[in-house]
């Protein structure tokens, strides 16, 4: 069963009564000591053009990966896996084009680079959008995705979600202006979790995508699963 946690009272800008901007799960994400990765740890990049970069870096490091920011094709060449974070998918897509990263990123993922897209990252990976909207997409994941399917920032909510392949009970995640999969377009896509009958976690080969923000709740199991995937694909 999916459990929804109420969010604190806040205004239209997401600020609570203290004037601070509220993000679901943010209470669990704070300053953490740097952890030196073990010898032989996989190098996992986080696309760092816009969006929720720092929390992904921290989660990956807690999972034992050597986590680095990726902003250029040269930096992309150094990683063994890539996380596409939440943020604003149109902005990230345009910055991918402007930075010269769009085609190199598409080709590396197509060639087998493990990729994990969350929220906006899922949108970028998708083959199609449900809305009539022109924006850059990588087009590698066989799904049709609807942007902002769960409402605006003020409609954000937390979920305890059962995810196929993740042990230890439901995973705590946050839906923040989240997309959802409207239609699976390929038999190669495996649905790992649903909300109200719509897929919200899918996998296609070495591509993992989630409609929510797993990085802000402190539950690192999806990141740990992705780091394990990256490690398993090494020569």
Model regions and ranges:
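N-terminal beta1-alpha1 cap of cysteine-dependent amidohydrolase-like domains
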Residues: 1-98, 103-108, 220-235
